[in-house]
């Protein structure tokens, strides 16, 4: 849809980051606002549209952030989480970005790191807010192929908003 129509707002309302004006989001039959955030975020991964970071993270550190919902409040990632993050980066094809500062990555590199961060959470649902924005054609194809593979081969449900109907149709379920 066009700019300013509310695509991002809709996604944020769906996952409880913004309130609905009326109605509610049901998550496994329960109002999402009545659930513990850890219960929600251990099942859903969200890749936001904005990509600026207040802190300097390496690719590996960014991917590790995806395990936060599975750790205690002050618990640091251990050897197991680091190995999971390294394996996820290998799976997504971005091991070369492990030590690169996210603020110095290209749009395509960062998007793949954010996808790896979302996947390490082992979600049942992944929500992508305009994942191809700012990417060149090659990186758009990489991201869209990854979304399609997640949905069709790995059974992860995906909700994606986009300005490009052709991109949406290329990864949509065709049942």
What kind of region is each of these model predictions?
Residues 64, 79-97:
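Conserved ABC ATPase "signature" region
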């Amino acid at each position: 849809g066009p700019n300013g129509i509310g695509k991002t707002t809709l996604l944020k309302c769906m996952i409880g980051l913004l309130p609905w004006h009326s109605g509610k989001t049901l998550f496994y039959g329960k109002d999402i606002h009545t659930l513990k955030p850890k219960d929600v975020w251990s099942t859903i991964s969200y890749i936001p549209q904005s990509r600026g970071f207040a802190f300097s993270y390496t690719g590996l550190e960014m991917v590790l952030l995806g395990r936060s919902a599975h750790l205690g409040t002050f618990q640091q990632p251990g050897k197991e989480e680091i190995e999971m993050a390294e394996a996820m980066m290998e799976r997504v094809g971005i091991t070369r970005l492990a030590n690169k500062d996210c603020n110095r990555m290209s749009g395509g590199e960062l998007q793949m790191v954010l996808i790896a961060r979302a996947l390490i959470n082992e979600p049942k649902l992944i929500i992508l807010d305009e994942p191809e924005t700012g990417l060149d054609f090659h990186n758009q194809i990489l991201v869209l192929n990854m979304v399609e593979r997640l949905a069709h081969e790995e059974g992860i449900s995906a909700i994606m908003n986009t300005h490009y109907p052709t991109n949406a149709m290329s990864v949509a379920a065709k049942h």
